[in-house]
Amino acid sequence: MSSLRFRVVEKAFQTKAREFSIPEERPSEYFGKYVFNREKMFKYLPGDVFAKLVDVIDNGAALDSGIADEVASGMKRWAMELGATHYTHWFQPLTEGTAEKHDAFVEHNGKGGMMEEFSGKLLVQQEPDASSFPNGGIRNTFEARGYSAWDPSSPVFVVDDTLCIPTIFISYTGESLDYKTPLLKALRAMNKAAVDVCHYFDPSVKKVFSYLGWEQEYFLVDEGLYAARPDLLLTGRTLMGHEASKNQQLEDHYFGAIPIRVAAFMKDLEIQALELGIPVKTRHNEVAPNQFELAPIYEECNLAVDHNMLIMSLMRKVARAHGFRVLLHEKPFKGINGSGKHNNWSLGTDNGIALMAPGKTAEENLRFITFIVNTLMAVYRHNGLLKASIMSATNAHRLGANEAPPAIISSFLGTQLSQVLDHLEVSTDEDMGVLVGKHGMKLDIPQIPELLIDNTDRNRTSPFAFTGNRFEFRAVGSEANCASAMIALNTAMAEQLTDFKRDVDEAMSDDVSKETAILQVLRRYIKTCKPIRFDGNGYSEEWKAEAARRGLDCETSCPVIFDNYLSESSVRMFTSTGVMTKVELEARNEVKWETYTKKIQIEARVLGDLAMNHIVPVATHYQSMLINNVYRLKELFDASEAEGMSAENISLIREIAERTAYIKKHVDDMVEARKVANRIDNVREKAIAYHDTIAPMLEQIRYHIDKLELIVDDQMWTLPKYRELLFIR
């Protein structure tokens, strides 16, 4: 096995950048080549059908079943011209991946031959087996039917030879079994509530969009090195491995020159992403060695989520073509930065108003502050739920590790905006009236300047930071489906804006103007949500103590954090907005607990196997060599001289014996602990047992394996080391 390590290292050093075809057209010309966008709709659909479909997409009108066949026919013609032979309903089950079943267009023509057929019924609805996906007990094998249904708001696209149709996925009884269904409901609820609030300032607003711009971090590892690490292959992260002498301490990788092989991968990925309509914009080296980032231009939230799921799939495919494996795990390597996926979230209206951006008039700035303060209220009221929405067995390794935001949700506003809110908090009604009437002179600034975008500092320790015209939800994990965080955030915002509208309407009277009522409510909210505002160092121990005093959720146990989904406030929020029922929430939590347990269980099995079948045999083999050396020294030299010569080897022999004995014992203990945990019927209690008992054992065993790596002869060590995984590019 050690020879495999050196063979793959040698091959990785010799691998050259892969050549690939680059389109002759400009990116703007081949953008969306494989997407059935409006340009294609106009070309392939009758005029009246095109108009009705656009109405469905833009205004949420009900899909007229009478046009489904014509839409399907147009899609089929377009897709077949691109070489498509199959179609699939492309959906996002609760696996945090995507699912698809490919069916061919061909059907019997009734004359002994075949023809291509794709009907409106096949476009609009399919029936996957719901019991074979995570469902939290909603579906059983004997009641397996589920439905996938077309989402017209996300355009269909062609990948290879398959027409992919974005769909929702629900059970036979109507419960959602995916991420898209509650996301669409959350966006609808947020839109309704936000439009009502916008009408205080602009009655012409008809729709409010939630926008998302994600930043996808990832690692690239040579495919041969990856294959020689069973832990990477099976769990997505290294379960053992001592830190390399050099990692990221020189701070020379961030924004550094992109390695040639990596640059070829990035360029190929970008071309294919642009052809699929994903507006990729940025690429660069990240902080850790062999860590990189990809980011697009922001898009409407539902489409942005679909594009992120598509890009992660595309990254895996393109990476293999270039001799890499892409690692999307939040913490694939110990001792260096993990990977996140910052979610840049904002709201905007159909007439072009950016609700999270300051304006030029007092009224525009009052609107701006209204949405900022309501966002803070939503985050404060549901800080535990927002943490649960981004928590997982994998992301838990990254959060709070002095490289990523802490596992305590707080919001950074920056000095300038904080001063504005602090002033409003202590203002009188008369002061606030002057604010509206005289362009904010009472705030000691004539207006909140557009340059606020540049005047807002960056606090990298904040999990939910205002960055000038949007909030950046930094706690989201690199492997996660963004929909989870966006469902929680947009639903919380919908509930909060609804409550704000009620409070303002109640405050308005003959003697209280609309503007004064708004400011009175905002002042009360600013006081209420003040605990969520924190501009200091989120990594500090002092903040943890302060956050607890403020009443923020400071829980760190992943399975316990999931309880937030079933809290009274969360259930009320999701049910009152129509986003999810209590049954759906209970099912999702069961899936979360089961997934957590299974991931720790897999890691424990893999580590136990590697420890007993790779590490211990190699260590004892090296120990035998040392023992033989000691005996030979005693044969060649007198006792006192041999004792001095062999002292170091005897010390190593003893240390190897102690560490291998510890590893064996703790692997046995871990097996027994799993047996005990597996007998627990309650899924929550089982997940807690795995968190409290088995997860710590992984680190204990790893500690001794990593110490052995420093002792055992490098030529005998079978697994690629960190210096090889991270610095061969």
Predicted stretch roles:
Residues A84, T88-F91, H307-R320, L347, ...:
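Hydrophobic/aromatic-rich, well-ordered segments within soluble, folded domains that form packed cores
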Residues I518, Y525-R729:
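C-terminal amphipathic alpha-helical interaction region
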Residues M1-E24, T141-F157, T162:
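N-terminal hydrophobic targeting/anchoring segments and the immediately downstream early-domain regions
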Residues F13-S119, V124-N140:
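Histidine/acidic residue-rich metal-binding segments in metalloenzymes
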Residues I67-V71, F91-P93, K121-L122, F169, ...:
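Active-site-proximal loop/turn and secondary-structure-junction residues that shape catalytic pockets
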Residues E96-G113, A130-S131, R229, G236-T238, ...:
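Short linear, low-complexity motifs centered on an aromatic residue
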Residues I67, F91, S119, P296-Y298, ...:
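Active-site proximal loops enriched in glycine and acidic residues that flank catalytic Cys/His/Asp
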Residues E143-L328, N337-G340, L347-E590:
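Glycine-rich, acidic/polar active-site loops that bind/position phosphate-bearing ligands
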